[in-house]
């Protein structure tokens, strides 16, 4: 299994709706609301790098309310 941590910036007021939708998305293992520079921390897990990339591109970055993301691949 491949894993990634994604930091997400959202449009103001979209936090609850985004968290709820992401928590029910296949491949997204955890969603945490943050205070500070980023709004959410999202843990993504997939069978391989391509699966992780697809989850991030298709299910996370394309969501309404998502302004920007920073992705960090987990090595161990």
How does the language model describe each region?
Residues 1-76:
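A compositional/biophysical signature of low hydrophobicity enriched in polar/charged and small residues
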């Amino acid at each position: 299994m491949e894993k990634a941590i994604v930091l997400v910036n959202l449009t103001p007021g979209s936090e609850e709706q985004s968290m709820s939708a992401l928590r029910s998305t296949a491949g997204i293992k955890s969603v945490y609301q943050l205070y500070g520079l980023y709004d959410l921390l999202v843990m993504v897990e997939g069978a391989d790098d391509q699966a992780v990339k697809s989850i991030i591109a298709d299910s996370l970055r394309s969501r309404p309310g998502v302004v920007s993301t920073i992705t960090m691949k987990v090595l161990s």
